[in-house]
């Protein structure tokens, strides 16, 4: 082998030049590859996400994008939105569509793009809003259905009272079975003179909570006994004849609706529809002074104290849509009837944060219902717990709650202006403090004053915020009216309500 001199080797001038050239070449190649990795490469959206279908109510679906260092998303229509406009690598993205009130199917596209990769198109389709087709449907009939929006109607309603613990009373057996009738909790059957007394005292509205599940003729089909419907209708007619607006609902009924999760949704929707179809048909011919309210305080009995999930809210909002669809599908005056839908657990804060307005085939004929029972330890905490007996500035420093005082009432009820300002009227379907009649002497005297101060303040704040307050009268010792004679039983509390109205 020929011996190579040191001057001809790696460290010779020529060798050094060669090394530098190779380093430059390698660096250029590395940069080129890096840029290729950043700007191009694979962009993937699984086929299962390429075609998204939504119902008319609007909702959200989640897709997964697996891309290079940077990718972009755009949507073709304003009603279809993406949670991201830009991202990198593998990420989940929410595609949300608004409710479709256009009365026709609509489509949009979502485009996912990245430099150096072909665009991926996701097709979005949303169905039109429609109601069920019932054989019992009749053409819309506006006889007795004034040309009033629900907001305009709410201004005529002013204030009302519940005839509680009566038609919604049920006895729950150890096996979960339901029985009983309107008298099983100790109140008499409502009569004509009761409703006349309510009207004479200055009230405009009566809410009649009703249960039906304990009166099924056929539990498999949810067929309600005609005799029970007759009783409810007799009370409704008596209240209307007295000149009152009347609200009927499906109340607690043992809590069968209180499992709002997707796994139960189909069965619960089916039962709710079957029951409301019968109720709507029975009361279809009444004028617009009769309002239907879909449910009551729907929550999740299986939550064990945990906060509601997005699934809970969505399914409960869906109950409202089933109710509206079912009533409208019966036609006649129900086509125009004013309907009342509920926030989750009828809670004000949850209404503001999570309520979704149901779609409707008529405009501006829906109320929202919330209840107000703050502070809990003053209003409805059981008598055998550490309740508070006093309320308000007059008793500051006394046996009052830390929350739920005047400022809190103002803040909570005024938050409902988000609906009022958008022409969605709000009914406070229940409010009122428990009467702690086990107290005596000065303690009872201060408690009674606190109750009436509270009642007046809630009503006054409702009026200020254009809300319709309905006092919860459960009968018994705290009732406003004698259920048999219709005469005032608690004149001071009635006076507090009327003072709050003025």
Swiss-Prot record:
Single Gene Ontology MF annotation: beta-glucosidase activity
Disruption phenotype: Cells are not able to growth on xyloglucan polysaccharide, This phenotype can be directly rescued by the addition of xyloglucan oligosaccharides.
The name this protein goes by in its record: Xyloglucan-specific endo-beta-1,4-glucanase BoGH5A
Organism: Bacteroides ovatus (strain ATCC 8483 / DSM 1896 / JCM 5824 / BCRC 10623 / CCUG 4943 / NCTC 11153)
Pfam families for the chain: BACON, Cellulase
Keywords from the named record: Carbohydrate metabolism, Cell outer membrane, Glycosidase, Hydrolase, Lipoprotein, Membrane, Palmitate, Polysaccharide degradation, Signal
Domain text: The BACON domain was initially thought to act as a carbohydrate-binding domain. However, it does not bind carbohydrates and may rather be required to distance the catalytic module from the cell surface and confer additional mobility to the catalytic domain for attack of the polysaccharide.
Pathway this chain belongs to: Glucan metabolism; xyloglucan degradation
Annotated positions binding substrate: 165, 172, 251, 296, 472
Lineage: Bacteria, Pseudomonadati, Bacteroidota, Bacteroidia, Bacteroidales
Domain BACON: 67-127
Residues of the signal peptide: 1-32
Membrane topology category: Lipid-anchor
Transmembrane segments: none
Impact upon substituting residue 33 to A: Abolishes surface localization and hampers growth on xyloglucans
Catalytic activity as recorded in UniProt: xyloglucan + H2O = xyloglucan oligosaccharides
Misc: Gut bacteria supply the human body with energy from dietary polysaccharides through glycosidases that are absent in the human genome. Xyloglucans are a ubiquitous family of highly branched plant cell wall polysaccharides present in the vegetables we consume. Enzymes involved in xyloglucan degradation mediate the conversion of otherwise indigestible plant polysaccharides to short-chain fatty acids.
EC number: 3.2.1.151
Family: Belongs to the glycosyl hydrolase 5 (cellulase A) family.
BP GO annotations: symbiotic process benefiting host; xyloglucan catabolic process
């Amino acid at each position: 082998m020929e011996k190579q001199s040191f001057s001809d080797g790696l460290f010779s001038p020529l060798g050094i030049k060669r090394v530098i050239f190779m380093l430059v070449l390698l660096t250029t190649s590395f940069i080129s590859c890096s840029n290729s990795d950043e700007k191009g490469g694979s962009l993937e959206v699984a086929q299962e996400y390429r075609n998204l279908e939504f119902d008319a109510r609007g909702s959200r679906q989640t897709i997964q994008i697996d891309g290079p260092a940077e990718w972009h998303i755009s949507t073709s229509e304003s009603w279809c939105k993406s949670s991201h406009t830009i991202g990198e690598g593998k990420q989940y993205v929410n595609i949300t569509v608004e409710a479709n009130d256009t009365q026709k199917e609509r489509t949009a596209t979502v485009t996912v793009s990245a430099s150096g990769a072909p665009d991926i198109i996701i097709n979005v389709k949303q169905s039109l809003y429609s109601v069920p087709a019932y054989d019992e449907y009749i053409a819309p009939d506006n006889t007795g259905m004034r040309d009033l929006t629900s907001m305009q109607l709410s201004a005529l309603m002013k204030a009302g009272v519940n005839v509680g613990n009566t038609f919604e009373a049920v006895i729950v057996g150890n096996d979960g079975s339901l029985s009983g009738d309107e008298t099983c909790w100790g109140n008499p059957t409502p009569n004509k003179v009761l409703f006349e007394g309510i009207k004479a005292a200055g009230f405009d509205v009566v809410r009649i909570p009703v249960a039906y599940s304990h009166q099924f003729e056929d539990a498999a089909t949810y067929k309600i006994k005609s005799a029970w419907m007759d009783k409810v209708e007799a009370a409704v007619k008596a209240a209307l004849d007295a000149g009152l607006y009347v609200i009927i609902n499906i109340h607690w009924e043992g809590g069968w609706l209180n499992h709002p999760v997707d796994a139960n949704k189909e069965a619960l929707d089916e039962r709710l529809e079957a029951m409301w179809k019968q109720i709507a048909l029975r009361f279809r011919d009444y004028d617009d002074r009769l309002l239907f309210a879909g449910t009551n305080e729907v929550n999740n009995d299986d939550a064990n104290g945990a906060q509601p999930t997005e699934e809970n809210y969505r399914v409960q909002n869906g109950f409202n849509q089933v109710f509206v669809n079912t009533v409208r599908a019966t036609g006649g005056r129900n086509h125009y009837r004013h309907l009342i839908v509920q926030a989750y657990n009828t809670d004000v804060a949850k209404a503001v944060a999570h309520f979704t307005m149901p779609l409707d085939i008529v405009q501006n004929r829906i109320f929202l219902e919330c209840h107000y029972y703050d502070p809990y330890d003053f209003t409805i905490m059981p008598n055998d717990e550490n309740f508070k007996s006093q309320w308000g500035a007059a008793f500051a420093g006394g046996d009052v709650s830390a929350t739920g005082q005047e400022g809190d009432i103002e803040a909570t009820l005024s938050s409902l202006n988000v609906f009022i300002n958008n022409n969605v009227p709000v009914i406070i379907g229940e409010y009122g403090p428990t009467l702690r009649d086990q107290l005596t002497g000065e303690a009872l005297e201060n408690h009674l004053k606190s109750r009436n101060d509270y009642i007046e303040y809630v009503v006054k704040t409702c009026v200020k915020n254009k809300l319709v307050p309905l006092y919860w009268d459960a009968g018994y010792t705290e009732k406003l009216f004698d259920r048999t004679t219709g005469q005032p039983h608690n004149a001071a509390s009635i006076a507090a309500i009327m003072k709050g109205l003025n």
